[in-house]
Amino acid sequence: MKKLFLALLLAGGAVAAQAEEARLLRFPATNGKDVVFTYAGDLYRVPIAGGEATRLTSHVGTEMFARFSPDGQQIAFTAQYDGNTEVYLMPKTGGEPERLTYTATNERDDIGDRMGPNNIVMTWTRDGKNILYRNRISDGFSGKLWSVSVEGDMPEQLPLPEGGFCSYSPDGKKLAYNRVMREFRTWKYYKGGMADD
């Protein structure tokens, strides 16, 4: 009996260790030639045709929501390195990220929060000069769309009441956007039924 218990305990520990190591490929984006995605908190790039993924970042912190520039040469992304979640920019080949935003720390500012992290990169303007991101100013339950220049100038709020994921029309004259942000709501974490055993 003791041997059976010990075997089950060891097997359970091995399964638990494997579960801790399991990580998801998240937040993919493409420029038509490559795909950039987050794995274990770092950014990777892989050819759209397949092949080996290249690790682009290895910083202490988390990178997510990467978006290629219209010319496909730069990547804007959201990262949390020092407690604040901010917008960063780097070449598509990797390198040292350039911080573009400097915002106040929100109490609830992580990927596990039901409202999601702050300063999520949404898209680029068609001319490649600005990056749109969603900011949850004042730690609120609604997000506002902001634009920051790739030169790092002062961000500007778009004249919209609320905003979430968005995309420009091919000519860059119109912006389609979601007013409600629900991508991190707790009901999306549902893992099973409510039926009796």
Model-derived features with residue positions:
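Mature N-terminal segment immediately following signal peptide/propeptide cleavage
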Residues: 20-48
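Beta-propeller domains with acidic blade repeats across secreted/periplasmic ectodomains
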Residues: 55-56
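Hydrophobic h-region of N-terminal signal peptides that target proteins for export
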Residues: 8-17
